[in-house]
């Protein structure tokens, strides 16, 4: 297969010279893209181009990456979508329920140019444009498949939106999905037993799509329509950012994941409600995990709230009970946003019980549940504080976190980064010291950190005897 068939430039978009996808963590269903029998892969490693049908060493380029509970999806620069991992509910989009441990193109979307993808627990959603479109008019449409989506193949879905509505973003939760239109409207569908659809009521059974048109800015005022710019679905809760940089949350809040000191409906919030603790703070990014939520401010600070039993808030080991006190260090649950990282954060991703961030200095940090190495380089089952993940090179463009695995999409946009990409492919335990020394002297910080991690890994006896993912040999 010709490389341009997969990684061509079918759209006039700005592309890096090369991209890399790193996937690691829990691998029971092959969600890391390796065909081996390893149950877990604790070291991030680039997925080689040949996995996607390209020649070894090809300059692969990627647009997006997403993680579900046990499946993964990636968008190539030519608009092709690849999926792999668990498929028990048809979430891979191939019309079967057979899992795959290697990436395969979703053939039913070959007439579409996929722009972005989102993975829920057992479903997948993608935003795409028809390939015959000349690119002068945006026609971004929504495709869904998997659990509760009515098909094991991708199907075009308008829901409550009028046909030809331009879809800006989609986010999938455990059993619900929310889509954002270019006009700033949200529509939600799926299960609503905890109010995660934002309708003001709870419902039994699968619910069709409906536009969310009531947002509670103040409890003593009537709800009103708010223009939304971003949305994120957690397991049973939802968060959104308004055009004014405000955060609204709704759904299950029993673990403090909504960020409200008190809830209006027992352990739930049935309508989108503004997180007043963040008043005056402009938020640019929000991410929902299983029972926690994180937000990044315009100035690069990270706030977190919700359940912290596994360390997913990054605040250290905690014992105690629910607390409304913002700085109560004994609280197991933080139902009011607390500052975790004061500055420098660019991106955040929340998995079921772990969190990843990337910083302006190009580094990645993770924390939370770590039994499969999905959060940090540490051997421990819990990473209580932000811990560096120094196995990736290139400029971080996207972070993704799933049930027990993680993924990073990086770009090489400069000659230095391209050289780091090339050298990283050839680093082994035998030459790590030499390459690392040269990298340090020439300012190749990411490559130097990778080599240092590998040296530490060697001194540590190969990390508890697991297979070394850099050299392919047991150290």
Language-model segments: what does each one mean?
Residues 1-414, 426:
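Eukaryote-biased RCC1-like beta-propeller repeat architecture
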Residues 474-475:
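Acidic, low-complexity intrinsically disordered termini and linkers
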């Amino acid at each position: 297969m010709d490389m341009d068939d997969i990684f061509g430039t079918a759209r006039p978009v700005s592309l890096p010279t090369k991209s890399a996808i790193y996937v690691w963590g829990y691998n029971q269903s092959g969600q890391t893209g390796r065909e081996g029998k390893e149950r877990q892969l604790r070291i991030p490693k680039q997925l080689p181009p040949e996995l996607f049908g390209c020649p070894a060493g090809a300059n692969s380029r990627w647009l997006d990456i997403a993680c579900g509970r046990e499946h993964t999806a990636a968008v190539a620069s030519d608009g092709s979508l690849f999926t792999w991992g668990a498929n028990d509910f048809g979430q891979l989009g191939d019309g079967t329920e057979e899992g795959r441990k290697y990436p395969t193109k979703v053939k039913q979307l070959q007439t579409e140019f996929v722009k972005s993808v989102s993975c829920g627990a057992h479903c997948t959603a993608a935003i795409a444009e028809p390939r015959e479109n000349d690119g002068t008019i945006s026609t971004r449409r929504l495709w869904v498949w998997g659990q509760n989506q009515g098909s094991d193949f991708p199907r075009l879905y308008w829901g409550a939106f009028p046909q030809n509505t331009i879809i800006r973003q989609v986010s999938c939760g455990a059993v619900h999905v929310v889509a954002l239109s270019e006009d700033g409207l949200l529509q939600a569908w799926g299960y609503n037993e905890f109010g995660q659809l934002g309708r003001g009521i709870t419902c039994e059974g699968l619910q069709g799509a409906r536009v969310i048109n009531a947002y509670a800015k103040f409890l003593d005022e009537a709800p009103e329509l708010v223009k939304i710019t971003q949305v994120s679905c957690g397991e049973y809760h939802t968060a959104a950012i308004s055009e004014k940089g405000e955060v609204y949350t709704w759904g299950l809040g029993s673990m403090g994941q909504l960020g409200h000191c008190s809830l209006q409906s027992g352990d739930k919030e049935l309508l989108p409600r503004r997180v007043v603790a963040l008043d005056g703070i402009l938020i640019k990014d929000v991410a929902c995990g299983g029972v926690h939520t994180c937000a990044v401010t315009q100035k690069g600070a990270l706030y977190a709230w919700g359940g912290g039993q596994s360390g997913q808030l990054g605040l250290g080991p905690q014992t105690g009970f629910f607390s409304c006190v913002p700085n109560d260090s004994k609280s197991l649950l933080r139902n009011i946003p607390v500052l975790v990282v004061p500055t420098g954060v660019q991106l955040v991703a929340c998995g079921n019980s772990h969190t990843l961030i990337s910083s302006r200095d190009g580094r990645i940090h993770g924390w939370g549940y770590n039994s499969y190495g999905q959060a940090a380089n540490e051997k421990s089952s819990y990473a209580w504080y932000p811990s560096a993940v120094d196995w990736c090179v290139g400029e971080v463009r996207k972070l993704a976190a799933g049930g027990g695995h993680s993924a990073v999409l990086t770009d090489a946009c400069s000659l230095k980064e391209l050289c780091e990409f090339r050298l990283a492919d050839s680093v082994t335990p035998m030459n790590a010291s030499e390459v690392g020394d040269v990298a340090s002297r020439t300012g190749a910080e990411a490559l130097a950190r990778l080599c240092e991690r590998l040296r530490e890994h060697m001194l540590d006896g190969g990390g508890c005897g697991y297979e070394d993912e850099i050299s392919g040999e047991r150290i």
